[in-house]
Curated annotation (Swiss-Prot):
Gene Ontology annotations for the cellular component aspect, listed alphabetically: axon cytoplasm; centrosome; ciliary tip; cilium; cytoplasm; cytoplasmic dynein complex; cytoskeleton; cytosol
Listed result of changing S88A: Abolishes growth factor-mediated phosphorylation. Increases BCL2L11 protein level and promotes apoptosis
Protein's UniProt name: Dynein light chain 1, cytoplasmic
Top-level taxonomic group: Eukaryota
Subunit structure: Homodimer. Monomer; the monomeric form is incapable of binding to target proteins. The cytoplasmic dynein 1 complex consists of two catalytic heavy chains (HCs) and a number of non-catalytic subunits presented by intermediate chains (ICs), light intermediate chains (LICs) and light chains (LCs); the composition seems to vary in respect to the IC, LIC and LC composition. The heavy chain homodimer serves as a scaffold for the probable homodimeric assembly of the respective non-catalytic subunits. The ICs and LICs bind directly to the HC dimer and the LCs assemble on the IC dimer.
Sample GO molecular function, one term: enzyme binding
Length: 89
C-alpha cells in the first residue's frame, strides 16, 4: 500500500523526525485497520524512540487545538487519513 501520498500540513519538528513520523504512520496503516490501533502504534513507537509522552490522533474528520513541546509537533495526511502527532507532558 505505497500509494498513500504524504502531505505535511503543519510541522514544528526536525526533518528527520518528520520523515520518521511518516514512515511510522505508513507501517501502522499497513498493519492496522482501526484508527485507534493506528494511533496507538505511532504513539508507542515515538514514546520508545523519542521518550514519552507523545499523543496521536488519527482520523478523517476532526478538529484540534493542542499545546505541544517546542519542536515536537506534526500534522499530516497519508492519503485520506489525517494524523496529528505531538509531545506534551
Amino acid at each position: 500500500m505505497c500509494d498513500r501520498k504524504a502531505v505535511i500540513k503543519n510541522a514544528d519538528m526536525s526533518e528527520e523526525m518528520q520523515q520518521d513520523s511518516v514512515e511510522c504512520a505508513t507501517q501502522a496503516l499497513e498493519k492496522y485497520n482501526i484508527e485507534k490501533d493506528i494511533a496507538a502504534h505511532i504513539k508507542k513507537e515515538f514514546d520508545k524512540k523519542y521518550n514519552p509522552t507523545w499523543h496521536c490522533i488519527v482520523g478523517r474528520n476532526f478538529g484540534s487545538y493542542v499545546t505541544h513541546e517546542t519542536k515536537h509537533f506534526i500534522y499530516f495526511y497519508l492519503g485520506q487519513v489525517a494524523i496529528l502527532l505531538f509531545k506534551s507532558g
